[in-house]
């Protein structure tokens, strides 16, 4: 008897693992963990997250734009990053109110649960302050998805700032998406935290400076004040332990060259100094992977940016 029960349980787990179909009401709805509704502004590229249910692997995210007379489905996504999160790589630039919900599905995208409770967020424009950046500004880590408050430095910046960052971006990619992603929000001040991916992958300091100068020129042409942040350092030992790509070239020289240029611009925040150890590397106690500052590091960045904005743009904070 016990053997039959064991084999039946093993078969049930196997069916779920390989996407087999079971009753749509087999699982309870997922509990959502992203916290967009508690942020000053919804991120341009939201990362939806939820608490994964045992014996499940696949999830569907649906995003709906709330209409005056009729709601409209604007996203139907299926997770490919992990069991508990999914980043939306299509930017939310259209103002309005939205809600999102999640349900369990099988490999064939057939529902295995009801929809979760709805969570709402609002897209507004124009904004006074915004940040253009990469994963350090987008938020998130291996252990905490980007949509949670504790994994974004913007949470610790007590000046409300719109998050226009996108994980993985180089300065060229930010330049390429500037018109589509920045201009709809018409920020008065744009914080630019960019360049770490460039130097990590071997770009020269001059190449990064060229792109930053182009970003500056785009800002000025659109009556936006650019505020550059110094490029944070990296910890090569931790980076290699985590299997993250890192150039064999002299990334420190490139980073220092770019930071010297940044510190000669009219408006800049030195967020890197406090995060750097005596050897010039990102402090090991502030990073889980050698590239991304963890909670304490994000608190430092958020505090420094807020102090700078309040000191230099007091009439706008």
Describe each model-derived feature in a short phrase:
Residues 92-108:
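Beta-strand-rich modules
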Residues 100, 174, 266-267, 283-317:
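Histidine-centered active-site loop/cap adjacent to the catalytic His
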Residues 53-70:
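Solvent-exposed loop/turn segments flanking beta-strands in beta-repeat/beta-sandwich domains
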Residues 20-47:
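Short, compositionally biased P/S/T/A/G/V-rich stretches that sit at domain boundaries
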